[in-house]
């Protein structure tokens, strides 16, 4: 789960990370009075969307008077902001964050992530802050600093000293950096985050370190322990089909293709998407019904797939282990009766109760195209939509 910048800063401040401060606006009629509450010479107006690249897209602007700030804020509120992460459709700006501006002497990058490939927590830092860190890693990899933390032993003093030293901090700034490292680590662990990113972390005109922008991503599986964080969820920033799927206990991610996929198991789902592309088409979604899906969940999964108007065909690929193939078959028939399936439907079943599942489907009035293996299924659905 992602949250907005102003929410991330609120959490980090609770752990002792110094951040820039401001006020959030969620209604246009509140813009003027909110700006009037800020006593500053420079205003920074920031669009609050769950996407990077806001600055280059016009989602972060500076104003040097109250009147200018009010005009900028009114112009920004409600627009569709298009960045390199939103796609061409953009993201509507329903919230803006208005901060007091400050002088910036130097910008840094600092983050903590869960590195699955190394099975450890990793700090990533760079003296090249305020820019896309992926671009820095590609063009100047020597500027990227990494410190791995063993989860068994946790954060140690040498991690904090090492990060401060590699970033070139000395004396009081080194002390500040060590405190920030410790605070960010504690926030990461205690909130079940998967990433905390501060970009940029700056030195202001007083020589102090300050988090000017912040991003936090949380592990959805840990949210049940953090109702205060769950309450920060902004459903307007999420795909409505993905939200609907999550409420039904399904793992669904919308994609750009036109072949809907319903699969059990994340690995099999990815393999299914790969082979669809191999045969010359693109998947419309990732959808994992899970190992314990019942008839109702299967029916809801098909309804969600068909809610995407771009879907021209559906491939159901089930390997019955815990999941029984006859349950899948019953769910398909129930969905067809409820909403009607008017696009080509290819079904590949294998595993528990497979013969019973095939019998249920063959005895139905549905025009189902059976497939005996994954390659056959991909070939048939691609041919069917052409």
From Swiss-Prot:
Binding site for Mg(2+): 199, 213
GO biological process: succinyl-CoA metabolic process; tricarboxylic acid cycle
Domain ATP-grasp: start-end pairs: 9-244
Domain of life per record: Bacteria
Binding site for substrate: 264, 321-323
Enzyme class: ligase
Molecular function terms, GO-annotated: ATP binding; magnesium ion binding; succinate-CoA ligase (ADP-forming) activity; succinate-CoA ligase (GDP-forming) activity
GO cellular component, one term: cytosol
Residues annotated for ATP binding in this entry: 46, 53-55, 99, 102, 107
Ligase found in the keyword field: yes
Hydrolase as UniProt keyword: no
Cofactor note: Binds 1 Mg(2+) ion per subunit.
EC number: 6.2.1.5
Pathway, per record: Carbohydrate metabolism; tricarboxylic acid cycle; succinate from succinyl-CoA (ligase route): step 1/1
Cofactor(s) recorded in Swiss-Prot or TrEMBL: Mg(2+)
Family annotation (SUPFAM superfamilies): Glutathione synthetase ATP-binding domain-like, Succinyl-CoA synthetase domains
Keywords: ATP-binding, Ligase, Magnesium, Metal-binding, Nucleotide-binding, Tricarboxylic acid cycle
Catalyzed reaction equations: succinate + ATP + CoA = succinyl-CoA + ADP + phosphate; GTP + succinate + CoA = succinyl-CoA + GDP + phosphate
Function: Succinyl-CoA synthetase functions in the citric acid cycle (TCA), coupling the hydrolysis of succinyl-CoA to the synthesis of either ATP or GTP and thus represents the only step of substrate-level phosphorylation in the TCA. The beta subunit provides nucleotide specificity of the enzyme and binds the substrate succinate, while the binding sites for coenzyme A and phosphate are found in the alpha subunit.
Family recorded in the similarity comment: Belongs to the succinate/malate CoA ligase beta subunit family.
Subunit (UniProt): Heterotetramer of two alpha and two beta subunits.
Protein name listed in UniProt: Succinate--CoA ligase [ADP-forming] subunit beta
Species of the source: Rickettsia prowazekii (strain Madrid E)
Gene of this entry: sucC
């Amino acid at each position: 789960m992602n949250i907005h910048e102003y929410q991330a800063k609120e959490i980090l401040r609770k752990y002792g990370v110094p951040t820039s401060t401001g006020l959030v606006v969620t209604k246009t009629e509140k813009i003027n009075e909110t700006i009037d509450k800020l006593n500053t010479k420079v205003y920074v107006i920031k669009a609050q969307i769950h996407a990077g690249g806001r600055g280059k897209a016009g989602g972060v602007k500076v104003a040097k008077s109250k009147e200018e700030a009010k005009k900028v804020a009114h112009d920004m509120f409600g627009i569709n902001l298009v960045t390199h992460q939103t796609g061409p459709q953009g993201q509507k700006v329903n919230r803006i964050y208005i901060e007091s501006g400050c002088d910036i002497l130097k910008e840094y990058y600092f983050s903590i992530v869960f590195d699955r490939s190394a099975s450890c927590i990793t700090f990533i830092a760079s003296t090249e802050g305020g820019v896309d860190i992926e671009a820095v890693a590609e063009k100047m990899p020597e500027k990227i600093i990494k410190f791995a933390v063993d989860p068994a032993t946790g954060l140690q003093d040498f991690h904090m000293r090492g990060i401060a030293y590699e970033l070139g901090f000395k004396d009081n700034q080194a002390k500040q950096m060590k405190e920030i490292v410790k605070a960010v680590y504690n926030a990461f662990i205690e909130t079940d985050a998967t990433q905390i990113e501060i970009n940029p972390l700056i030195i202001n005109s007083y020589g102090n370190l300050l988090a000017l922008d912040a991003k936090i991503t949380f592990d959805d599986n840990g949210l049940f322990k953090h109702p205060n964080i769950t309450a920060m969820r902004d459903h307007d920033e999420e795909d409505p089909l993905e939200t609907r799927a999550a409420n039904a206990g399904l793992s669904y991610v919308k994609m750009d293709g036109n072949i809907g996929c319903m699969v059990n198991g994340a690995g099999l789902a990815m393999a299914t998407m790969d082979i669809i592309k191999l045969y010359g088409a693109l998947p419309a979604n990732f959808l994992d019904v899970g190992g314990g899906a019942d008839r109702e969940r299967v029916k809801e999964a098909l309804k969600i797939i068909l809610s995407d108007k771009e879907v021209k065909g559906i491939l159901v690929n089930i390997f019955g282990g815990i999941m029984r193939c006859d349950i899948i078959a019953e769910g398909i028939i129930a969905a067809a009766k409820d909403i009607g399936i008017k696009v080509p439907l290819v079904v590949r079943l294998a595993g528990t109760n497979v013969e019973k599942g095939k019998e249920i489907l063959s005895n139905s009035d549905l025009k189902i195209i059976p497939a005996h293996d994954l390659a056959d299924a991909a070939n048939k659905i691609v041919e069917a939509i052409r």
